Amino acid sequence: MTIPFSSIAVIGAGTMGSGIAGQIANAGHSVLLLDLPAEGDDPNAASSRAIERLLKSDPPSLMDKKRAELIECGNTRDDFDRLAQCDWIIEAVVERLDIKKELYKRLDSVIRPDCVVTSNTSTIPISLLVEDMPGSFRERFAITHYFNPVRYMRLLELVRGEETSPAIMEKLADYNDRFLGKGVVPCGDTPGFLGNRVGVYALQVGLDEAHRQNLTVEEADAIMGRPMGIPKTGVFGLYDLIGIDLMADVVDTLENILPQGDAFFAVGKDGPVAPLIASMIAEGYTGDKGKGGFYRLAGDGSENAINLGDGSTRPRTKTLPALAEAAAMLQASGDAVSYTHLRAHETSL
């Protein structure tokens, strides 16, 4: 079987970068995973910790723990020149345009003429990413936006730039389909593409509505989970899974590139939960990858949840099954779902 790419690297060993590397390893292919050099004796500590997280993840990110042996750790100081051997490099660094642009310029000085470079950006248009790059780079550049968790989320948004070679788009679609098991969806070069243009707005509305309706995070997640077409994590659990800091960057990026007057601004950085999110990030509560987020562990190992009103924590409570059941019934009937409806319906169950 012909493999479109024989030497692959991922730059950025965060949740998404490590997940992408893990799925490449699941396909039986080796991959180089780079991150910033760490202080101390082990400059590869960031990428090494990423592999440890893959091995401990639940549900499992790797089909077999031995697949981790196919992921080679490195850092962008000592191993950057090794990228000259690659024919596909996936950028999965922080969602900031300035950092991505700086990386591309550095890449252009070392990569071989036929190397394909793609970004895992979830929101930034390709026209902005490569606006300062030469034509030879732009024709080999595309966006491959995976979703978290990479092993289980089948969708891949594939975005072509004005100058991207059609042959390269075919190679990317072929590899992701045949080897990574992705459902490849071609997307236009618009802010947020398809998934995040709709999905991030929906999540932000969920945060604001929970605050406005005076819901607990548990109640909100029971209501705005499966009945609303959102994963069983619900809104706040999904925020924790994605990363609260990453979501803040995504919101910031969308506000910087969407036209003034777009409905997104009403639920973005000016939303009622925004100050709480900013303070959580400042204190290191960035979600599952950090000290916790809207849900977090107490010192005794028990689960706590945050109060949206004042940011205090309390023991996590189980929501009444009637809430989720009522939401599902209301959704099936086509009625508008509100907390008042749910409480009334709960009483009748």
PLM regions: where:
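NAD(P)+-binding Rossmann beta1-loop-alpha1 motif at the extreme N-terminus of oxidoreductases
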Residues: 1-53, 110
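Amphipathic alpha-helical segments at domain termini/boundaries
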Residues: 26, 33, 63-88, 171-181, ...
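Rossmann-like NAD(P)-binding element
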Residues: 37-42, 55-117, 124-126, 291
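Rossmann-fold dinucleotide-binding core
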Residues: 113-197, 232, 315-317
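Rossmann-like dinucleotide-binding core of oxidoreductases
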Residues: 192, 197, 201-222
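Interdomain hinge/lid region at the active-site interface
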Residues: 222, 226-299, 304
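Intrinsic disorder at enzyme termini
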Residues: 286, 293, 299-328
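Conserved small/polar residues in nucleotide/adenosyl-binding loops
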Residues: 340-347
